Amino acid sequence: MTKQLSTVRTDQFETKTQFVDAVELYLFDKKLRLLVMDALERIEIGLRVDIAYLLGQRNTFAHLDATALHPTFAGKVDKRSGKTTFDIWQDKYKGLLDRSKEDFVKHYREKHGPHLPLWVAVEIWDFGAISQLLAMMKVADQQQIASKYGVNDWKVFKSWVRSLSYLRNLSAHHSRLWNRNMTDQPGLPTHKGDIDWCDDFIGKADLIARPFLLLSIARHMIKVVCPRTEWHLRVQQHLQQFPLQHSNRKLSIADMGAPAGWEGWWIK
């Protein structure tokens, strides 16, 4: 799902803008990216466990076997390369395997052969590999994992994981985050009330296109992975310290896509 907001940028500075305004926004954004990476690391580990446990019960090498996945999702042919989605994922996995410097990879391959079982292979996957494999899984399997996170629609959950992978790439590559127009936008429940906090975003393209929605998804998922986490409280504290500007145009976390009254559900 991608939507572009119409924005007008000029080379003119807002009246009374000072250099310190740009510096403080940069520092705010830098800390925000660090907070995001902290959450996504734990969510990534949780998803690895979810996939390894579910698929590994039935097939030790499910990640190497297209028949363990949804035939349509895994068998879709990319027009540009002529390869199936599964084959493209295999290429990615082999690249991660070849680049891995982990001792356990070398040890296992020397002792047991070239193919890592699923519960070992997951340790070298990045967020993108996790997202792509999840998207190839059978509907019942995707829904089982989605349900663990309180999401009733597997398609919505799949889009959440994909968008968090995008968020992870932005944060890891030091891209500006706080007011970015997000080109990979997650889906939301069709009906209000399915996930209470989502109600503030449903049908609001201007909010869906901003990063606060992805922060909210990260909050939702990390509270499942780490029930006693205080990550969301640290994020709230950081957001409430949004830097004041000297310029006539006053920026705020509303420019991040934060809906009115977000604090009410964020701390729960």
Segments and roles (model prediction):
Residues 1-268:
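Long, contiguous internal "core" modules enriched in hydrophobic/ aromatic residues
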